Design a protein with these regions (language model features):
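A detector for short, charged/polar N-terminal pre-domain segments
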Residues: 1-8
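Short, charged recognition helix plus adjacent turn
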Residues: 3, 15, 21, 40, ...
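Short basic helix-loop element that most often maps to the first helix and adjoining turn
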Residues: 9-30
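Residue-level detection of the helix-turn-helix DNA-binding "recognition helix"
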Residues: 18, 43-44, 57
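Residues in the helix-turn-helix
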Residues: 26, 37, 65
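Recognition helix of helix-turn-helix/homeodomain-like DNA-binding domains
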Residues: 32-47
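DNA major-groove recognition helix of helix-turn-helix/homeodomain DNA-binding modules
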Residues: 50-66
Length: 82
């Protein structure tokens, strides 16, 4: 099974946190982890779906939308190949 998803979720979370003018300390408190762990999240290109859900809920932002968009784009290209 080919997995070709060019989403760097950690980077997207960092960018949204900055856009929301929220701190790393704020996010760490909201999701119940250390600031150091949040910095590690920023460096990860993929995360567990439960963690993405917790972050989405805390930030009131649907990070799953990036995966949905990538899935739909892939589906369109596969349909176009047939």
């Amino acid at each position: 099974m080919e997995h070709n998803c060019n989403i760097h979720i950690g980077q997207l979370i960092r960018e949204q946190l900055k856009a929301d003018q929220r701190s790393v300390g704020w996010l760490s408190r909201e999701i119940g982890c250390t600031r150091n762990h949040v910095y590690k999240i920023f460096n990860k290109s993929s995360l567990d779906s439960d963690l993405i859900f917790r972050i989405s809920k805390a930030m009131n932002f649907n990070f799953f939308q990036y995966y949905t968009a990538a899935f739909l784009e892939n589906l369109k290209s596969r349909i176009g190949e047939k």
